[in-house]
Amino acid sequence: MTIQTFTPDKVLVSEKKDGTLHKEFTDIIMKEVAENSLVMQLGKYHEMDGKQEKTVYVQTDGVSAYWVNETEKIKTDKPEIVPVQLRAKKLGIILVASREVLNYTWEKFFEEMKPQIVEAFYTKIDEAGLLGHETPFANSVAKAAKDASKVVGGPVTYENILKLEDKLLDSDVEINAFVSRVSNRSALREARDGDKKTIYDKESNKLDGIIVVDMKSKNFKKGDILAGNFDNLIYGVPYNINYKISEEGQISTIQNADGTPINLFEQEMIAIRATMDIAVMITKTDAFAKLTDASNV
């Protein structure tokens, strides 16, 4: 009996329109997603051994409350190591392309679509884990800040940045990163102390000596800044990337220039839906704070 193997440089996309993405492709995508995702850069990775759920262990500070699963939190009265249930959820993206790609080899198709797939995945992960936008997860950095009453309302100023830091320092949280956006940089440069010295170093992109990472998302508004100790953001990736290619139907989440949904058959296009399993969890309840416009508080 001849065993058939998948050879990306020979198999056409039209011959394999659904399944698990080839390991070689998955490894490349996950490497580039990890290099760009702020959740993956700032958070703590836990190996899930291919499981949907995994018990991991977290060191507590003996003062704060900690989430041990999606719905249960405990109050600790002494430093200890507690078991935490990390549970993966599905995140999906949809991309569209011309129908001619069905005649590409998988190797050529991957080369052309990889940048879009990578960007779509890391954007989806960060919007879910940091902002709580269209998230399957029970918590996010922004939600944790709101739930802990650690939201400062107002513009990006020296005084408000200090208030943002104080929200965390009052709980003995050591800030190790700010999440901002490039459009905030002019305001950050103008954040000056009483001696008119700026607390933002544009060369190193540090604010008050702490690293700033910039998020690209239309759902993260100008003037918004997240702060916290991101060691309390944990994640794991148990499975490969699965995909399915469709040639018919309408795509309501992606629209034409006139606002109408894309009709795949009529417009001779295809839709690629890719899903990955990822677990993202906030462990410490008071580890994050947010600065946002006063109208949002």
Task: Explain the meaning of each model-derived region.
Residues Q59-T60, A97-R99, V182, A274-M276:
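Residues immediately flanking
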Residues S14-I93, T157, L162, A287:
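Assembly/oligomerization interface modules of large self-assembling protein complexes
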Residues T20, E24-I28, K108, E112, ...:
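Generic recognition of stable, solvent-exposed alpha-helical segments in well-folded globular domains
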Residues S64-W67, T105, A187-E190, M281-T283:
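Short helix/loop capping segments that flank catalytic or ligand/cofactor-binding pockets
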Residues G92-S171, K290-V297:
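Alpha-helical scaffold segments that mediate packing/assembly in large oligomeric complexes
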Residues K150-E266, I270, M276:
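Extended oligomerization regions of viral-like shell subunits
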Residues M1-D27, N36-L38, Y45, P261-V297:
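Protruding loop/beta-arch "assembly-hinge" segments enriched in small, turn-prone residues
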